[in-house]
Amino acid sequence: EFKNMIKFGDIIKHKNKKSLKLVNKNSEFENLAFVVDGEASITIENNVEVAKLKKGDWISEFSFITGDKTSANVISNDIFAISWSKATLQKLKIKKPELFEKLNSLIARNLCEKLIRSNKK
């Protein structure tokens, strides 16, 4: 079913020494993204990296779920991702509720995986 989600998203491809800022800290939720390949860094003040996102991870999922502002920056020099705008996700919730629920399940599973990874550090 995730394949059905792809057609509603936009492609992000970036490979450059200059980092692409995917998320700005303390911003309103704008986009949810899925890392297809590459990686991204989650950073806080003074560009201190607190975590890495890799293939299969979601970007901005906390803000998507809670509606809160973003809690960190996300930057990347090498990433291939699929991104869905807030408006697209709202339409999906109304028009394809079963697909929207699957999306929430995928995100919940990934959050658990991230928690397990962070506990192993």
What are these regions (language model features)?
Residues 1-62:
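Regulatory nucleotide-sensing modules
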Residues 33, 64, 100, 115-119:
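Alpha-helix boundary/capping detector
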Residues 49-106:
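Cyclic-nucleotide recognition modules
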